[in-house]
């Protein structure tokens, strides 16, 4: 990247710094841009020129070796969000503006990032979880000096049951600590009742994402003994795959809780007759009901479902009836040509046939 380009990016980030002061809760998601940045670009620009708030930049400067993990955490969250919602009316697509505008100049998820809906809740939770997962993995891989394996589990076990702690347990507590330091913006720094409610909601959902990673920690063991007798086992704690964490958060999304939009000492359920039911730290919370994702809304940046591919025989969310919102669907035939019946010919090449197939593709009207 040449000097002129770097200077232009620096000026753009200075503008973002001013916006962060004016709109703190709305700018919380700028770091997510790192998840779609080209490999090596964030490291080349340096912490000062990235679309981060002042606290994040300071933490980045003190721990620059964590930048690859931050980028990987954002990538994990973005990818899993798209995977979990790929068949839904809202499919967690990155906005076109975010991919074409200069670095961080447009919110990655557009309207949903600051709408206070169930979709906002999932985005914040899965991105926070991605950061925990990525940083913890880096610790276990030995990529950082200040964290490694979970040292609290190096001793102990159960002699009577024939196992002891060993190996390298994932230090998820360090990942959670860093995620809180990097993502959680103090509520006291905001003005306006609406801002405070939305920020409190986002902070809660950040923590819900972190709790999902911790909740799905599992124990792996390796056997030791003559001829595989497993007389003694060495065990360690490890994080689940991020796909499994995504499934848990999707379930939390389906059962998310609407909270009151009025500022109180603590968040309350919106429905008065349910306020005695406690809100748990691993619940996903939202303030506003989701918009109609069936039809295009250019003002909100909602593309609608017209033209989306659907499954004619499915009764689920990907089925044409649900995805197309009752508008019906178009069917067209797609011709596929691929190599098939490949054989190795001595010596030395592979000979294949060209096989054609026709497939019906259904798209929403």
From Swiss-Prot:
Disulfide bonding pattern of the chain: 81-92, 139-147, 149-168, 221-235, 223-230, 294-325, 310-320, 324-364, 340-355, 342-352, 347-348
Pfam family, one: wnt
Lipid-attached positions, O-palmitoleoyl serine: 227
Single GO MF annotation: cytokine activity
Signal peptide: 1-29
Cellular component terms (Gene Ontology): cytoplasm; extracellular region; extracellular space
UniProt tissue specificity: Isoform Wnt-16b is expressed in peripheral lymphoid organs such as spleen, appendix, and lymph nodes, in kidney but not in bone marrow. Isoform Wnt-16a is expressed at significant levels only in the pancreas.
Family according to the record: Belongs to the Wnt family.
Task of the protein: Ligand for members of the frizzled family of seven transmembrane receptors. Probable developmental protein. May be a signaling molecule which affects the development of discrete regions of tissues. Is likely to signal over only few cell diameters.
The protein, known as: Protein Wnt-16
Source organism per UniProt: Homo sapiens (Human)
Upper taxonomic lineage: Eukaryota, Metazoa, Chordata, Craniata, Vertebrata
């Amino acid at each position: 990247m040449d000097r002129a380009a770097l200077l232009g990016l620096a000026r753009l980030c200075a503008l973002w710094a001013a916006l962060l002061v004016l709109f703190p809760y709305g700018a919380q998601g700028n770091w997510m841009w790192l998840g779609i940045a080209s490999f090596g670009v964030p490291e080349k620009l340096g912490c000062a020129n990235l679309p981060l708030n002042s606290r994040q930049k300071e933490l980045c400067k003190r721990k620059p070796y964590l930048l690859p993990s931050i980028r990987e955490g954002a990538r994990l969250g973005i990818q899993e969000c798209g995977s979990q919602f790929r068949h839904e009316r809202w499919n967690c697509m990155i906005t076109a503006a975010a991919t074409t505008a200069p670095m961080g100049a447009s919110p990655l998820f557009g309207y949903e990032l600051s709408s206070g809906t169930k979709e906002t809740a999932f985005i914040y939770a899965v991105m926070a979880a991605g950061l925990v997962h990525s940083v913890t993995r880096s610790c276990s891989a030995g990529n950082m000096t200040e964290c490694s394996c979970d040292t609290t589990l190096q001793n102990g076990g159960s002699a009577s049951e024939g196992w002891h702690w060993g190996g390298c347990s994932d230090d998820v507590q360090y990942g959670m600590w860093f995620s809180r330091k990097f993502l959680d913006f103090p509520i006291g720094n905001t003005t306006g009742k609406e801002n405070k409610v939305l920020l409190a909601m986002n902070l809660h959902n950040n923590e819900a994402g972190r709790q999902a990673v911790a909740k799905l920690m599992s124990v792996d063991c390796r056997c030791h003994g003559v001829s595989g007798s497993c007389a003694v086992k060495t065990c360690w704690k490890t994080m689940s795959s991020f796909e499994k964490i995504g499934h848990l958060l999707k379930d939390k999304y389906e059962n998310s809780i609407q909270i009151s939009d009025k500022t109180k000492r603590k968040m309350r359920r919106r429905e008065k007759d349910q306020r005695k039911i406690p809100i748990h730290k691993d619940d996903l919370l939202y303030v506003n009901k989701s918009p109609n994702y069936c039809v295009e809304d250019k003002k909100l940046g909602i593309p609608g479902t017209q033209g989306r591919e659907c499954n004619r025989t499915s009764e689920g969310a990907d089925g044409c009836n649900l995805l197309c919102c009752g508008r019906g669907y178009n069917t067209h035939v797609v011709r596929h040509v691929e190599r098939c019946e490949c054989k190795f010919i001595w010596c030395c090449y592979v000979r294949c046939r060209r096989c054609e197939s026709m497939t019906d593709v259904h798209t929403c009207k």
